[in-house]
Curated annotation (Swiss-Prot):
Role played: This is one of the proteins that bind and probably mediate the attachment of the 5S RNA into the large ribosomal subunit, where it forms part of the central protuberance. In the 70S ribosome it contacts protein S13 of the 30S subunit (bridge B1b), connecting the 2 subunits; this bridge is implicated in subunit movement. Contacts the P site tRNA; the 5S rRNA and some of its associated proteins might help stabilize positioning of ribosome-bound tRNAs.
Name of the protein: Large ribosomal subunit protein uL5
InterPro entries: Ribosomal_uL5, Ribosomal_uL5_bac-type, Ribosomal_uL5_C, Ribosomal_uL5_CS, Ribosomal_uL5_dom_sf, Ribosomal_uL5_N
A GO cellular-component term linked to this record: ribosome
Length: 179
């Protein structure tokens, strides 16, 4: 079991119970899933780019990504409905906790010119989204084998009812928010 999951059960639940005066342990917000999304717009011209992006995402997450397709045609971008234009992975359970731990302890500190993550990236329902400009911050990606530096979106979905609860949950994990 991931250390961060044990830490959540032992420490974070107690801390949030007292902070928000919950009556039941089930009211305490928890991390439900983490979604990684990589948009590869250049895949229209070269299908191999999408395969490389999917391989990178599989290495980062430890799970085979789902190829996302365009929902509608956009003439300005030369995209037709149904064209493969990206890939995504939804992590839950054990893999989610392991990825979350790697994200906080290893990947985020390796971001170039890192001064902390914005605390304003909550969506109003306690979910946090962040963008990463380079996939090479993850230790699973071999820098020499990267054909192109790509970014990805990371969304942390929680059961929190408000941004305040979501922020308190992530702060309890020592999430590196900007001061």
């Amino acid at each position: 079991m991931a250390k961060l999951h044990d830490y959540y059960k032992d420490e974070v639940v107690k801390k949030l119970m007292t902070q928000f005066n919950y009556n039941s342990v089930m009211q305490v917000p928890r991390v439900e899933k983490i979604t990684l999304n990589m948009g590869v717009g250049e895949a229209i011209a070269d299908k191999k780019l999408l395969d490389n992006a999917a391989a990178d995402l599989a290495a980062i997450s430890g799970q085979k990504p789902l190829i996302t397709k365009a929902r509608k045609s956009v003439a300005g971008f030369k995209i037709r409905q149904g064209y493969p234009i990206g890939c995504k992975v939804t992590l839950r359970g054990e893999r989610m906790w392991e990825f979350f731990e790697r994200l906080i302890t290893i990947a985020v500190p390796r971001i170039r010119d890192f001064r902390g993550l914005s605390a304003k990236s909550f969506d109003g329902r306690g979910n946090y989204s962040m963008g990463v400009r380079e996939q090479i911050i993850f230790p699973e990606i071999d820098y020499d084998k990267v054909d192109r530096v790509r970014g990805l979106d990371i969304t942390i979905t929680t059961t929190a009812k408000s941004d305040e609860e979501g922020r308190a949950l992530l702060a309890a994990f020592d999430f590196p928010f900007r001061k």
